[in-house]
Amino acid sequence: MFTYHSANTSAAQPALVNAIEQGLRAELGVVTEDDILMELTKWVEASDNDILSDIYQQTINYVVSGQHPTL
């Protein structure tokens, strides 16, 4: 028997964006919202895991909707 637990993606999205921002900042020095969106888009396209792809897509929507503080 399986128990369904809803993922708390509302907490995961800011953390994922911050992690991407830190990685890109270390690599590029300066990070824009477009850089983060491009990185997430690459991850969606490269992922074979539907769950991860969905999380990445939700995070893209989170960034585009303006819920993440401006970089």
From Swiss-Prot:
The lineage of its organism: Bacteria, Pseudomonadati, Pseudomonadota, Gammaproteobacteria, Enterobacterales. NCBIfam families: PRK11436.1 (NF008515). InterPro entries: Biofilm-dep_modulation_Bdm_put (IPR019625). It holds the Pfam family BDM. This is Protein bdm homolog. It comes from Salmonella typhimurium (strain LT2 / SGSC1412 / ATCC 700720).
